[in-house]
Amino acid sequence: MFDTTLLILLGLAALGFISHNTTVAISILVLIIVRVTPLNTFFPWIEKQGLTVGIIILTIGVMAPIASGTLPPSTLIHSFMNWKSLLAIAVGVFVSWLGGRGVSLMGTQPHLVAGLLVGTVLGVALFRGVPVGPLIAAGIISLFIGKS
């Protein structure tokens, strides 16, 4: 039987390879493997917990320089004494807030997820973005449609 979903995933993986974005390509190939093997029984868990696991892994990656000591405490302290660093802190707070609104919106408005995913994959593949886009994009959408 013809599997349209598999064809779409293969197309998106190809787009990831063509654009030299291995993050997208590998992610989609992993999902294809899960789809075509008995691992597909894990999709409900992946759909429910995947975003949380991804955020945890992303946070570990961001916090690793602090934990390893390559970002010394003095640098952290100085970040409160420079206007550019203070601006970076403010932007970080704002974007985190947007991401939080985005997670809520994606949970309550699942029909928006498809558009967010397509937009994110295109942004990652064509414009060298990173796949944190759906959360922030959903947060921005929540500002326009008034949902939190």
Curated annotation (Swiss-Prot):
Q: Which GO terms describe its cellular component?
A: plasma membrane
TM segments? 14-34, 51-71, 86-106, 121-141
Protein family per UniProt:
Belongs to the UPF0756 family.
In which broad location class does this protein mainly occur, judging by the first location in its UniProt entry? membrane
Keyword terms, alphabetized = Cell membrane, Membrane, Transmembrane, Transmembrane helix
* Protein name as annotated: UPF0756 membrane protein KPK_3307
Pfam families in UniProt: DUF441
Give yes or no: UniProt keyword Membrane: yes
Biological source species: Klebsiella pneumoniae (strain 342)
Which domain of life does the UniProt lineage start with? Bacteria
Report membrane topology.
Multi-pass membrane protein
- InterPro entries per the record? UPF0756_TM (IPR007382)
Q: Where in the cell is it found?
A: Cell membrane
Report the HAMAP family cross-referenced here. UPF0756
Instruction: Respond yes or no to whether keyword Glycoprotein is given for this record.
Output: no
